[in-house]
Each structure stands twice: as structure tokens, then as C-alpha cells.
Design a protein with these regions (language model features):
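The feature captures the beta-strand-to-loop junction immediately N-terminal to the Walker
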Residues: 18-20
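ABC-family P-loop ATPase nucleotide-binding domains
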Residues: 53, 60-117
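Conserved beta-strand
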Residues: 1-13, 39
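Conserved ABC transporter NBD signature motif
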Residues: 34, 38-54
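Catalytic Walker B motif of ABC-type/P-loop ATPase nucleotide-binding domains
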Residues: 130-134, 139
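ABC transporter nucleotide-binding domain
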Residues: 145-160, 164-231
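Helix N-cap at the start of a conserved alpha-helix in ABC-type nucleotide-binding domains
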Residues: 141-143
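Short, conserved post-Walker A segment of ABC-type ATPase nucleotide-binding domains
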Residues: 15, 26-35
Length: 250
């Protein structure tokens, strides 16, 4: 079990971590992973910072936690096997093939390929706890679907996924934790009906959000404009849909 100041993440479940940009999602994951010291966090009942018994059971991967640029894919497997007590070499090689990762230095991979390698590394580590910080960034549609498929295959491990795509991953999650001024957490079914995702031009999203006056749980810039998650649990959905339609949002 993982306990922080605001949340408790139960063992064996897949947890979504959502919140506005800059709220501290990555920092929280780094604290859980023992990379940053924090007095308010316990993992398996112990402080994770500089605690090898915890660090051997927890892995954090994401675009902000890159692997060394000079390492080739083969070396990653060698290092992983040396570092992680329960490293699964067969699973590592299997997923490299499934994600069609080229045998190149990490530095020469595309952003999506780096995301895939980080995810593969986390899965193959055999760690009981996987912390995935927006692990899908840069993945094309085909590999994104494969990513979700592999997550389903790993169900039963404790996973915390920081995401801007709550509606997209909702079917994989057991719980959601929302970071903010008033943090809340609970089963996914209690949240999903009241959390709405709006997409469209950035200026229209900003104007609509101000008019609605509802909390924005996260914002993300996309090639077509932006995406925002709105906490509408305390509001009627009809005015929201009318406002979204008026601003040309989806």
C-alpha cells in the first residue's frame, strides 16, 4: 500500500492520477519512487527515499524520466537484468518486438519510441509498483492501443498512471485521484460520469471554462488546439453541453 498526505493507493489496483499542469503530479510520483525525500509518504509501510528494499520494488518511467542517451536497446536489457531482482528478459524482448522498437541508441529514437521503451522497461522490471508518468506521449494510434492492451495484461500489479486522458483510460482504471486545492480520490465509477472532456481551439476552451465557472482538472495543448477535463459532478450537464456547442467544442 502507498500512502501520501492526500491519497492512499491500494495494492494490486490501477490508479489514475489527474490534475492541472504544474500541480505536482510528477513530483508526487518521484517522491513515491524514492527520488525525492518526503516525510509524508510511505510505500509498503516504509519511507521510500534511499531505502533499497523499497526501491527494488518500485519503478518510475515517463518522458521526464529518460534512460541514458548513449545506451543501446541491448544494453538496456543487460542493465535492467543487473538492476532489478525480478527482471523478465523474455518479456522485455517480446515487447520490443510487439512495439517494433529499432535496435538503435536511445538518443536516436523518436519521442514515441522512447515512451514505448520506458514502458517496456517498467513492465519487464518485474517491480510490484509501476509509476507511469504520461507514458503514452508520442505513441501513434496503433502503439497506443498496444500500450492499453499490455496494461490490461499487467492487471494485478499496482500501477499509478499520471494522465490527461481520463476518459480514454477509464476502462483500465480502478480508482482516480484528483490533485488540487481540495484533493479527492475514489473508485473510477464514482467519477467518470461527472468528469467531462472538452476539446477544441485553445481560446474557445478558455472562454468556455470561464463562462462555466467549473474546476478544470487538467489542461493539455494538442496539435488541433487543446483538451481540458472539467469537474461537472456538482453541475447540470445540459448547460455545459450548450456552452460547449456554442463555442464549437467537442
Amino acid at each position: 500500500m502507498i500512502k501520501t498526505r492526500d491519497f492512499t493507493f491500494a495494492d494490486g489496483l490501477t490508479h489514475g492520477l489527474v490534475g492541472p499542469n504544474g500541480i505536482g503530479k510528477t513530483t508526487l510520483l518521484r517522491q513515491i519512487a524514492g527520488q525525492i525525500q518526503s516525510g509524508g509518504i510511505t510505500v509498503f509501510g516504509e519511507q521510500p527515499f534511499d531505502n533499497q528494499s523499497v526501491l527494488n520494488r518500485v519503478i518510475l518511467m515517463g518522458i521526464d524520466n529518460p534512460l541514458p542517451d548513449s545506451w543501446g536497446i541491448g544494453k538496456l536489457g543487460v542493465i535492467g537484468k543487473a538492476r532489478w531482482p525480478h527482471w523478465d528478459d523474455e518479456r522485455f524482448n517480446e515487447l520490443l518486438v510487439r512495439f517494433d522498437v529499432p535496435a538503435k541508441a536511445y538518443s536516436s529514437l523518436s519521442r514515441g519510441q522512447k515512451s514505448a521503451v520506458g514502458f517496456i522497461f517498467a513492465v519487464a522490471s518485474g517491480c510490484e509498483v509501476m509509476l507511469l508518468d504520461e507514458p503514452y506521449l508520442g505513441l501513434d494510434t496503433q502503439r497506443r492501443e498496444l500500450f492499453y492492451q499490455v496494461l490490461r495484461e499487467e492487471h494485478g500489479r499496482t500501477m499509478i498512471i499520471s494522465t490527461h486522458h481520463l476518459n480514454e483510460v477509464a476502462g483500465l482504471l480502478d480508482t482516480v485521484s484528483l490533485m488540487g486545492d481540495s484533493p479527492i480520490s475514489g473508485p473510477i465509477d464514482d467519477f467518470i460520469e461527472g468528469i467531462l472532456e472538452l476539446t477544441g481551439p485553445s481560446e474557445a476552451l478558455t472562454a468556455a471554462a470561464e463562462e462555466l465557472g467549473l474546476p478544470a482538472l487538467s489542461r493539455q495543448t494538442t496539435p488541433l488546439g487543446g483538451r481540458v477535463l472539467i469537474d461537472a459532478r456538482s453541475a447540470s450537464t445540459d448547460p455545459i453541453f450548450r456552452t460547449a456547442q456554442a463555442y464549437g467544442l467537442r
